[in-house]
Amino acid sequence: RGLIHSLMSHALDYMHKQEMPISFLYPYSIPFYRKMGWEIVSDKLSFTVRDTQLPKPRPVSGMVERVSLDSEDYHNVHSYFALQRHGCLIRDNLSWEEYWRWDNDDMIAAVYYTKEHKPLGYVVYYIANDIFHIKEMVYLNIEANYGLWNYITAHFSMIDQVQGDNYSGEPMAYLFEDSEITEKISPYIMARIVNVRDFLEYYPYQIQPEDFKIHFKVHDKMAGWNEGDYMVSWHDGETFCEQVEDNQSINVVELDVNTLTAMLMGYKRPSYLYEHEKIRTEYYMLVWLERLIPVEKPYFSDYF
Protein backbone atom coordinates (compact mmCIF):
# COMPACT_ATOMS: atom_id res chain seq x y z
CA ARG A 1 0.00 0.00 0.00
CA GLY A 2 2.86 2.38 0.83
CA LEU A 3 4.42 1.90 -2.61
CA ILE A 4 1.15 2.50 -4.46
CA HIS A 5 0.44 5.57 -2.33
CA SER A 6 3.91 6.90 -3.17
CA LEU A 7 3.41 6.25 -6.89
CA MET A 8 0.03 8.01 -6.93
CA SER A 9 1.49 10.95 -5.02
CA HIS A 10 4.32 11.16 -7.56
CA ALA A 11 1.82 11.00 -10.45
CA LEU A 12 -0.23 13.84 -8.97
CA ASP A 13 2.88 15.94 -8.45
CA TYR A 14 3.91 15.33 -12.07
CA MET A 15 0.45 16.27 -13.39
CA HIS A 16 0.51 19.41 -11.24
CA LYS A 17 3.89 20.47 -12.64
CA GLN A 18 2.59 19.80 -16.16
CA GLU A 19 -0.36 22.12 -15.37
CA MET A 20 -2.95 19.43 -16.00
CA PRO A 21 -6.22 20.68 -14.45
CA ILE A 22 -7.97 17.32 -14.00
CA SER A 23 -7.21 13.59 -14.03
CA PHE A 24 -9.50 10.75 -15.21
CA LEU A 25 -9.16 7.02 -14.64
CA TYR A 26 -11.15 3.81 -14.72
CA PRO A 27 -10.95 2.40 -11.18
CA TYR A 28 -10.08 -1.13 -10.20
CA SER A 29 -11.22 -0.16 -6.69
CA ILE A 30 -13.49 2.81 -6.07
CA PRO A 31 -12.80 2.97 -2.29
CA PHE A 32 -9.04 2.94 -2.93
CA TYR A 33 -9.08 5.86 -5.36
CA ARG A 34 -11.56 7.79 -3.25
CA LYS A 35 -8.99 7.84 -0.45
CA MET A 36 -6.65 9.59 -2.88
CA GLY A 37 -9.12 12.24 -3.99
CA TRP A 38 -10.70 10.71 -7.08
CA GLU A 39 -14.50 10.57 -7.31
CA ILE A 40 -17.10 9.04 -9.60
CA VAL A 41 -18.14 11.53 -12.28
CA SER A 42 -20.00 9.40 -14.84
CA ASP A 43 -22.17 6.31 -15.10
CA LYS A 44 -22.62 3.54 -17.62
CA LEU A 45 -26.21 2.48 -18.30
CA SER A 46 -26.30 -0.99 -19.85
CA PHE A 47 -29.55 -1.71 -21.68
CA THR A 48 -31.34 -4.65 -23.27
CA VAL A 49 -34.16 -4.15 -25.78
CA ARG A 50 -36.16 -7.15 -27.00
CA ASP A 51 -36.87 -7.42 -30.73
CA THR A 52 -40.57 -6.75 -30.07
CA GLN A 53 -39.66 -3.50 -28.28
CA LEU A 54 -37.64 -2.00 -31.12
CA PRO A 55 -39.00 1.38 -32.24
CA LYS A 56 -41.12 1.52 -35.37
CA PRO A 57 -39.34 3.05 -38.39
CA ARG A 58 -39.64 6.82 -38.65
CA PRO A 59 -39.38 8.75 -41.93
CA VAL A 60 -35.98 10.40 -42.47
CA SER A 61 -34.51 11.99 -45.57
CA GLY A 62 -31.05 10.45 -45.24
CA MET A 63 -29.62 6.96 -45.17
CA VAL A 64 -27.16 4.78 -43.25
CA GLU A 65 -24.01 3.45 -44.89
CA ARG A 66 -21.43 1.03 -43.58
CA VAL A 67 -17.94 2.53 -43.46
CA SER A 68 -14.46 1.38 -42.54
CA LEU A 69 -13.43 1.62 -38.89
CA ASP A 70 -10.89 4.32 -39.77
CA SER A 71 -13.43 6.34 -41.78
CA GLU A 72 -12.83 10.08 -41.61
CA ASP A 73 -16.58 10.75 -41.53
CA TYR A 74 -17.02 8.44 -38.57
CA HIS A 75 -14.14 10.02 -36.65
CA ASN A 76 -15.27 13.54 -37.50
CA VAL A 77 -18.75 12.89 -36.11
CA HIS A 78 -17.22 11.82 -32.81
CA SER A 79 -14.94 14.88 -32.70
CA TYR A 80 -17.88 17.22 -33.26
CA PHE A 81 -19.97 15.33 -30.71
CA ALA A 82 -17.15 15.53 -28.14
CA LEU A 83 -16.92 19.30 -28.56
CA GLN A 84 -20.66 19.60 -27.85
CA ARG A 85 -20.83 17.28 -24.84
CA HIS A 86 -19.67 18.04 -21.33
CA GLY A 87 -16.70 15.93 -20.22
CA CYS A 88 -16.37 13.90 -23.42
CA LEU A 89 -12.87 12.83 -24.48
CA ILE A 90 -11.60 14.31 -27.76
CA ARG A 91 -9.88 11.27 -29.23
CA ASP A 92 -6.42 11.53 -30.76
CA ASN A 93 -4.74 8.66 -32.61
CA LEU A 94 -3.64 7.00 -29.37
CA SER A 95 -7.17 7.24 -27.97
CA TRP A 96 -8.58 5.57 -31.07
CA GLU A 97 -6.03 2.76 -30.74
CA GLU A 98 -7.11 2.22 -27.13
CA TYR A 99 -10.76 2.38 -28.20
CA TRP A 100 -10.30 -0.67 -30.44
CA ARG A 101 -7.76 -2.57 -28.34
CA TRP A 102 -10.08 -5.15 -26.78
CA ASP A 103 -12.67 -5.55 -29.55
CA ASN A 104 -13.24 -8.49 -31.85
CA ASP A 105 -12.67 -8.47 -35.60
CA ASP A 106 -16.39 -8.53 -36.42
CA MET A 107 -17.01 -4.92 -35.37
CA ILE A 108 -18.92 -2.81 -37.91
CA ALA A 109 -19.32 0.97 -38.18
CA ALA A 110 -22.36 2.50 -39.87
CA VAL A 111 -22.79 6.25 -40.42
CA TYR A 112 -26.04 8.18 -40.89
CA TYR A 113 -25.83 10.67 -43.78
CA THR A 114 -28.31 13.40 -44.67
CA LYS A 115 -29.62 13.63 -48.24
CA GLU A 116 -26.71 16.07 -48.83
CA HIS A 117 -24.39 13.25 -47.64
CA LYS A 118 -23.43 15.07 -44.45
CA PRO A 119 -22.51 12.64 -41.63
CA LEU A 120 -24.60 13.26 -38.50
CA GLY A 121 -24.31 10.07 -36.46
CA TYR A 122 -22.97 6.56 -36.26
CA VAL A 123 -23.41 3.20 -34.58
CA VAL A 124 -20.56 0.76 -33.93
CA TYR A 125 -21.76 -2.81 -33.43
CA TYR A 126 -21.46 -6.52 -34.06
CA ILE A 127 -24.02 -9.33 -34.24
CA ALA A 128 -23.48 -12.60 -32.39
CA ASN A 129 -25.81 -15.28 -31.01
CA ASP A 130 -28.88 -13.39 -32.30
CA ILE A 131 -27.91 -10.28 -30.34
CA PHE A 132 -27.19 -6.86 -31.85
CA HIS A 133 -24.35 -5.58 -29.63
CA ILE A 134 -23.92 -1.78 -29.69
CA LYS A 135 -20.43 -0.63 -28.70
CA GLU A 136 -21.21 3.03 -29.25
CA MET A 137 -24.01 5.08 -30.76
CA VAL A 138 -23.58 8.81 -31.32
CA TYR A 139 -25.88 11.27 -33.06
CA LEU A 140 -25.78 15.02 -33.53
CA ASN A 141 -29.52 15.57 -33.95
CA ILE A 142 -32.83 13.72 -33.68
CA GLU A 143 -32.90 12.93 -37.41
CA ALA A 144 -29.70 10.92 -37.06
CA ASN A 145 -31.10 9.22 -33.95
CA TYR A 146 -34.18 8.09 -35.87
CA GLY A 147 -32.10 7.01 -38.84
CA LEU A 148 -29.76 4.88 -36.73
CA TRP A 149 -32.63 3.18 -34.90
CA ASN A 150 -34.30 2.53 -38.26
CA TYR A 151 -31.09 0.79 -39.29
CA ILE A 152 -31.02 -1.30 -36.11
CA THR A 153 -34.70 -2.22 -36.44
CA ALA A 154 -34.06 -3.33 -40.03
CA HIS A 155 -32.12 -6.26 -38.51
CA PHE A 156 -35.33 -7.45 -36.79
CA SER A 157 -35.39 -10.83 -38.57
CA MET A 158 -31.77 -11.56 -37.59
CA ILE A 159 -31.85 -10.79 -33.86
CA ASP A 160 -33.72 -11.49 -30.65
CA GLN A 161 -32.53 -8.43 -28.75
CA VAL A 162 -30.30 -5.36 -28.77
CA GLN A 163 -27.72 -4.81 -26.04
CA GLY A 164 -25.54 -1.77 -25.50
CA ASP A 165 -24.24 0.89 -23.16
CA ASN A 166 -25.43 4.45 -22.74
CA TYR A 167 -23.13 7.05 -21.16
CA SER A 168 -25.40 10.10 -21.28
CA GLY A 169 -26.41 9.82 -17.63
CA GLU A 170 -30.07 9.60 -18.62
CA PRO A 171 -32.15 6.38 -18.83
CA MET A 172 -33.50 5.52 -22.29
CA ALA A 173 -36.76 3.79 -21.34
CA TYR A 174 -38.90 6.94 -21.56
CA LEU A 175 -38.15 7.27 -25.29
CA PHE A 176 -39.46 3.81 -26.18
CA GLU A 177 -43.13 3.09 -26.88
CA ASP A 178 -42.70 -0.08 -24.82
CA SER A 179 -40.68 1.33 -21.94
CA GLU A 180 -40.26 -1.96 -20.10
CA ILE A 181 -36.74 -2.39 -21.40
CA THR A 182 -33.98 -3.54 -19.06
CA GLU A 183 -31.50 -0.93 -17.84
CA LYS A 184 -28.68 -1.35 -15.34
CA ILE A 185 -26.69 1.58 -13.98
CA SER A 186 -23.04 1.20 -12.92
CA PRO A 187 -20.45 3.78 -11.86
CA TYR A 188 -17.88 4.25 -14.60
CA ILE A 189 -15.11 6.87 -14.77
CA MET A 190 -13.56 8.64 -11.78
CA ALA A 191 -11.87 12.04 -11.84
CA ARG A 192 -10.10 14.41 -9.49
CA ILE A 193 -9.13 18.06 -9.76
CA VAL A 194 -5.33 18.36 -9.84
CA ASN A 195 -5.07 22.13 -9.37
CA VAL A 196 -8.01 23.62 -7.47
CA ARG A 197 -7.09 27.28 -7.93
CA ASP A 198 -6.74 27.01 -11.71
CA PHE A 199 -9.83 24.84 -12.05
CA LEU A 200 -11.98 27.31 -10.09
CA GLU A 201 -10.65 30.22 -12.15
CA TYR A 202 -11.13 28.65 -15.60
CA TYR A 203 -14.42 26.90 -14.82
CA PRO A 204 -17.34 27.91 -17.13
CA TYR A 205 -19.80 29.25 -14.55
CA GLN A 206 -23.36 29.82 -15.77
CA ILE A 207 -23.48 33.33 -14.31
CA GLN A 208 -20.82 35.88 -13.35
CA PRO A 209 -22.25 38.00 -10.52
CA GLU A 210 -19.97 41.01 -10.02
CA ASP A 211 -21.44 41.85 -6.62
CA PHE A 212 -20.82 38.40 -5.18
CA LYS A 213 -17.88 36.35 -3.91
CA ILE A 214 -17.77 32.72 -2.88
CA HIS A 215 -15.28 31.24 -0.42
CA PHE A 216 -14.34 27.59 -1.00
CA LYS A 217 -12.63 25.80 1.89
CA VAL A 218 -11.07 22.71 0.28
CA HIS A 219 -9.59 19.63 1.94
CA ASP A 220 -7.11 17.52 -0.03
CA LYS A 221 -4.88 15.07 1.86
CA MET A 222 -3.01 13.80 -1.20
CA ALA A 223 -2.24 17.10 -2.95
CA GLY A 224 -1.06 19.55 -0.31
CA TRP A 225 -1.00 22.47 -2.74
CA ASN A 226 -4.81 22.26 -2.96
CA GLU A 227 -5.48 22.29 0.79
CA GLY A 228 -6.77 25.70 1.80
CA ASP A 229 -9.17 28.55 1.17
CA TYR A 230 -10.09 30.08 -2.19
CA MET A 231 -12.02 33.24 -2.96
CA VAL A 232 -13.80 33.29 -6.33
CA SER A 233 -15.09 36.56 -7.79
CA TRP A 234 -16.11 38.00 -11.16
CA HIS A 235 -15.40 41.28 -12.93
CA ASP A 236 -15.99 42.43 -16.51
CA GLY A 237 -16.84 38.93 -17.67
CA GLU A 238 -13.75 37.33 -16.14
CA THR A 239 -13.41 34.92 -13.23
CA PHE A 240 -10.76 35.46 -10.58
CA CYS A 241 -9.63 33.00 -7.93
CA GLU A 242 -7.09 33.69 -5.22
CA GLN A 243 -5.90 31.59 -2.32
CA VAL A 244 -6.65 33.37 0.95
CA GLU A 245 -6.01 32.94 4.64
CA ASP A 246 -8.52 30.99 6.69
CA ASN A 247 -10.88 33.53 8.25
CA GLN A 248 -14.47 34.06 9.26
CA SER A 249 -15.52 35.00 5.74
CA ILE A 250 -19.13 34.82 4.59
CA ASN A 251 -20.40 32.66 1.70
CA VAL A 252 -18.21 29.75 2.79
CA VAL A 253 -18.56 26.34 1.13
CA GLU A 254 -16.48 23.64 2.84
CA LEU A 255 -15.86 20.31 1.10
CA ASP A 256 -13.17 17.84 0.10
CA VAL A 257 -11.61 17.64 -3.35
CA ASN A 258 -13.68 14.53 -4.19
CA THR A 259 -16.95 16.37 -3.66
CA LEU A 260 -15.71 19.51 -5.39
CA THR A 261 -14.86 17.42 -8.46
CA ALA A 262 -18.23 15.63 -8.55
CA MET A 263 -20.09 18.93 -8.09
CA LEU A 264 -18.22 21.02 -10.66
CA MET A 265 -18.28 18.19 -13.21
CA GLY A 266 -22.07 18.15 -12.84
CA TYR A 267 -22.30 14.55 -11.71
CA LYS A 268 -24.15 15.51 -8.52
CA ARG A 269 -26.01 18.74 -7.82
CA PRO A 270 -25.13 20.98 -4.83
CA SER A 271 -28.51 20.41 -3.15
CA TYR A 272 -28.04 16.63 -3.30
CA LEU A 273 -24.54 16.89 -1.83
CA TYR A 274 -25.77 19.21 0.92
CA GLU A 275 -28.63 16.87 1.85
CA HIS A 276 -26.15 13.99 2.16
CA GLU A 277 -23.73 16.09 4.25
CA LYS A 278 -21.00 16.14 1.62
CA ILE A 279 -20.72 19.93 1.71
CA ARG A 280 -20.95 22.29 4.67
CA THR A 281 -22.44 25.69 4.03
CA GLU A 282 -25.33 27.98 4.86
CA TYR A 283 -28.58 26.95 3.21
CA TYR A 284 -28.87 30.17 1.18
CA MET A 285 -25.60 29.29 -0.57
CA LEU A 286 -27.28 26.35 -2.29
CA VAL A 287 -29.27 28.78 -4.42
CA TRP A 288 -26.03 30.41 -5.58
CA LEU A 289 -24.28 27.10 -6.23
CA GLU A 290 -27.23 25.80 -8.24
CA ARG A 291 -27.18 28.96 -10.35
CA LEU A 292 -23.41 28.97 -10.84
CA ILE A 293 -22.88 25.32 -11.85
CA PRO A 294 -24.10 24.19 -15.30
CA VAL A 295 -26.81 21.52 -15.33
CA GLU A 296 -25.12 18.93 -17.52
CA LYS A 297 -23.80 15.48 -16.67
CA PRO A 298 -20.47 14.28 -18.07
CA TYR A 299 -20.47 11.95 -21.07
CA PHE A 300 -17.44 9.67 -20.90
CA SER A 301 -17.40 6.44 -22.91
CA ASP A 302 -13.67 5.74 -23.18
CA TYR A 303 -11.60 3.36 -21.09
CA PHE A 304 -8.05 3.70 -19.79
Regions found by a protein language model. Give the residues of each.
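Amide-forming acyltransferase catalytic core, primarily the GNAT-like/NAT-type
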Residues: 42-135, 142-146, 150-155, 187, ...
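Active-site/acyl-donor-binding loops of N-acyltransferases
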Residues: 37-58, 135-304
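Flexible loop/turn segments at secondary-structure boundaries
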Residues: 31-33, 119, 131, 170-173
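Short acidic/polar capping segments at secondary-structure boundaries
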Residues: 29-31, 70-71
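Conserved GNAT acetyl-CoA-binding A-motif
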Residues: 8, 12-27, 157-167
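Conserved acetyl-CoA pyrophosphate-binding loop and the N-cap/start of the following alpha-helix
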Residues: 2-10, 143-147
